[in-house]
A protein has these predicted regions:
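Hydrophobic helical membrane-anchoring modules
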Residues: 1, 175-278
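Hydrophobic targeting segments
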Residues: 1-6, 15, 22, 36-41, ...
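Short, well-formed alpha-helical segments that are part of the catalytic scaffolds
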Residues: 11-27
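Donor nucleotide-sugar binding loop of glycosyltransferases
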Residues: 11-14, 45, 73, 99
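Conserved donor nucleotide-binding strand/loop of the catalytic core
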Residues: 32-33, 37-39, 50-83
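A conserved acidic beta->alpha catalytic loop
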Residues: 42-50, 96
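Acceptor/aglycone-binding surface of glycosyltransferases and processive sugar-polymer synthases
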Residues: 68-83, 88, 100-181, 208-217
């Protein structure tokens, strides 16, 4: 069985279309995917997110609502993963930005021996359509540079499409501390420490309007989270031999930034990013 976790904060407008497309896709690819259930994690939404999720429940695609009172995408994904019980568990964003054809590819990779399969917008065969302004694109580039220092060998940590062996990821998220948008980085670090074989696959990705990530509001916090992750996972020993990804980077920890309070860590982290080579 495959369970798909969808974190949702005030997603009453975008979620119905995503669930409709997912239901059609699952019906057309039942042979490759098998039985599928969706876990929509209502992240303390102020709108009708939970209601539209329940309305989408059907025999063709069962939809279950999981409630998460702690705000933050990382907290919501963690709650959904812990509520799962399937052999294969995925999470994807509520906006449906990643093409669903990646599901069959990911499931097949798991059958061939991968433990974790993540969508990557940075691979040569990926097709992306972004509408970011220059300032957001520059911030994203700096963030990627830093994230790669914590997850060497992984090209794109932040794509909202990841598929896991259920037992492995449920164990990994037990100690997950990052509640915000940088949770992917901590999760990947912990999975590597657990010896997981991580593979990246190319995806089709479209920037869907209405993102809940607002750079002015969340950008500094995301950088500070990276510093906290570097600090909280210090001393852990990942197994780089188990990572299969396109492109490699040498690990370079950030002890100076990680040891500082968040208010000070952010400018230090940004400074390190600007000084580091591509």
């Amino acid at each position: 069985m495959l369970q798909i976790v969808i974190p949702a904060f005030n997603e009453e407008r975008r979620l119905p279309r995503t669930l409709r497309e997912l239901r059609r896709h699952v019906a057309a690819h039942r042979g490759e995917l098998g039985r599928v259930e969706v876990l929509v994690v209502d992240n303390a939404s102020a709108d009708a997110t939970a209601d539209v999720a329940r309305a989408a429940d059907s025999s063709a695609l069962p939809v279950r609502v999981v409630h998460c009172a702690r705000r933050g995408k990382g907290a919501a994904v963690r709650a959904g993963l812990l509520a799962s019980d399937a052999d294969v568990v995925a999470f994807m964003d509520a906006d449906g930005a990643t093409g669903l054809a990646a599901l069959e590819t990911a499931v097949q990779r798991l059958r061939l021996g991968a433990d974790v399969v993540i969508g990557s917008r940075g691979l040569d065969d990926s097709v992306t359509e972004a509408r970011h302004c220059r300032s957001r694109s520059a911030g994203a580039a700096a963030y990627r540079r830093l994230a790669r220092r914590l997850t060497p060998g992984i090209v794109d940590t932040q794509c909202g499409f990841k598929v896991f062996r259920g037992e492995l990821v449920r164990a990994a998220v037990q100690d997950l501390r990052t509640a915000g948008f940088s949770f992917d980085v901590e999760l990947l670090v912990r999975l590597r420490v657990a010896g997981a074989r991580i593979e990246e696959i190319p995806v089709t990705w479209v920037d869907v309007p209405g993102s809940t990530f607002v750079p002015a509001r969340h950008g500094a916090g995301a950088f500070a989270e990276l510093a906290r992750i570097a600090w909280s996972t210090r001393g852990l020993a990942p197994d780089p031999g188990r990572v299969a990804a396109s492109g490699t980077r040498s690990p370079m920890p950030l002890p100076a930034a990680a040891a500082l309070p968040a208010a000070v860590a952010v400018p230090v982290v940004v400074s390190l990013a600007l000084r580091s080579p591509r």
